[in-house]
């Protein structure tokens, strides 16, 4: 096709679709005895895009992975936490199966399966949620519960969570309604006290009350493109009953609440059961026995707990698990740094003793897997600073002494006569 303004005879040309003349449009494209203007081309593109949006959800729903497939995908990125992965796989599968069947099956209304993740910091709560969203190819957003307040107070409104989700999918409401929202630090909005107070708890119980309807399912009115609300404005209507909410928190001290409940009734005085220290359950074993009544005592209101029917507990990561995290997942930390070094033409080797030292440091800091990156970054900082300016470095070797800060990484050069250790 060619761009023409006049035919060979010099006659005025018109768009065959809208009838506008060549003087009313910017471009006129000629085909075999027909013409189309740039405006009609744009309109056709818009129609095709809308058609694709409508077809895409049906295509995604037909390819819903089974719980086994979801679990297998999580295994590629998350080490350990086997029970939590199984619980999540079933809950997520059931949620999207419910959406695919229009919330009903043979006339039976299917309930919503929001999820509560309980586990220490750095145990993989956020990573599990992110990995699920990536597998299902749905919009994902994170919110920090500590920044939320009731409407009308200084802080983030709970509806801002839905606004963030819309931003992730370019304000496509249909796509947002199939998304996943992860609310972190949910334990920090627990009720501050069991006793009623004359001062309003706007960041604790107040936020729980504000989140109730959002999590259960309501039609949230969100201003388009992140604008502020005003009366004359048209709002985007988002049905949150189709959005999967995953709430996570460390719940420090919950193990003591569970322990008190479990041990109550074991007798008092001479009838009490005496337990040795070795007989006492670990924190992970206690958290696995969590009941709604324990969460109520911790400070969550019963209505809020009722909106999170699926509870998964995560264990504190052991030293062996941290070593696995360093080298086994598809996006393992050591693989990431090896890829960075390969861009500079150098091979990066972590000796086993170095991985042990990194895991020991992370255990001592009690930061779980989250602390691994900062330890590796500190050990490699000087090398990453110098390497781009150095020639012929073929290999960088990291051993235990480098992690402990006692020596610098061993640099191996391409030319035998130039081999040297930077720590010498």
From Swiss-Prot:
Binding site for Zn(2+): 15, 18, 37, 40
Gene Ontology molecular function, alphabetical: ATP binding; ATP hydrolysis activity; ATP-dependent protein folding chaperone; protein dimerization activity; unfolded protein binding; zinc ion binding
Binding-site list for ATP: 120-127
SUPFAM superfamilies: Glucocorticoid receptor-like (DNA-binding domain), P-loop containing nucleoside triphosphate hydrolases
Domain (ClpX-type ZB) ranges: 2-56
Superkingdom of the source species: Bacteria
Similarity annotation: Belongs to the ClpX chaperone family.
Protein name: ATP-dependent Clp protease ATP-binding subunit ClpX
Organism per entry: Klebsiella pneumoniae (strain 342)
Taxonomic lineage of the native organism: Bacteria, Pseudomonadati, Pseudomonadota, Gammaproteobacteria, Enterobacterales
Gene designation per UniProt: clpX
């Amino acid at each position: 096709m060619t761009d023409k303004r006049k035919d060979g005879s010099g006659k005025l040309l018109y768009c065959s679709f809208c009838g506008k003349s060549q003087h009313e449009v910017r471009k006129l494209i000629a085909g075999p005895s027909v013409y189309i203007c740039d405006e009609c081309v744009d309109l056709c593109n818009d129609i095709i895009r809308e058609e694709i949006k409508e077809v895409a959800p049906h295509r995604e729903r037909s390819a819903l992975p089974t719980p086994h497939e979801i679990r297998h995908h999580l295994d590629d990125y998350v080490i350990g936490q086997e029970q939590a992965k199984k619980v999540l796989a079933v809950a997520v599968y059931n949620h999207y199966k419910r959406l695919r069947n229009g919330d009903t099956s043979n006339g039976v209304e299917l309930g919503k399966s929001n999820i509560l993740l309980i586990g220490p910091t750095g145990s993989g709560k956020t990573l599990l949620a992110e990995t699920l969203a990536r597998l299902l190819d749905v919009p994902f957003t994170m919110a920090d519960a500590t920044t939320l307040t009731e409407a009308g107070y200084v802080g983030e409104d709970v509806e801002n969570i839905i606004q963030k989700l819309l931003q992730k999918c370019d304000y496509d409401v249909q796509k947002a309604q199939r998304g996943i929202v992860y609310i972190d630090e949910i334990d920090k909005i627990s009720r501050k006290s069991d006793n009623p107070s004359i001062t309003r708890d706007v960041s604790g119980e107040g936020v729980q009350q504000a989140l109730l309807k959002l999590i259960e399912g309501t039609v949230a009115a969100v201003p388009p493109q992140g604008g502020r609300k005003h009366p004359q404005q048209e709002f985007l209507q988002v049905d949150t009953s189709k959005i999967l909410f995953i709430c996570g928190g460390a719940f420090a001290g919950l193990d003591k609440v569970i322990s008190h409940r479990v041990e109550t009734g074991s007798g008092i005085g001479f009838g009490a059961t005496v337990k040795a220290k070795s007989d006492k359950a670990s924190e992970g074993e206690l958290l696995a026995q969590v009941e709604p009544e324990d969460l109520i005592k911790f400070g969550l209101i019963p209505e809020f707990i009722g909106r999170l029917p699926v509870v998964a507990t995560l264990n504190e990561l052991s030293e062996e698990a941290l070593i696995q995290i360093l080298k086994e997942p598809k996006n393992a930390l050591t693989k990431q740094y090896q890829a960075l070094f390969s861009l500079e033409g150098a091979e990066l080797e972590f000796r086993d003793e170095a991985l042990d030292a990194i895991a020991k440091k992370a255990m001592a800091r009690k930061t779980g897997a989250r602390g691994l990156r900062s330890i590796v970054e500190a050990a490699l900082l000087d090398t990453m600073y110098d390497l781009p300016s150095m020639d012929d470095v073929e290999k960088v070797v990291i051993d235990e002494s480098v992690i402990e800060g006692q020596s610098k990484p061993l640099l191996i050069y391409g030319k035998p006569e130039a081999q040297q250790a930077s720590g010498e």
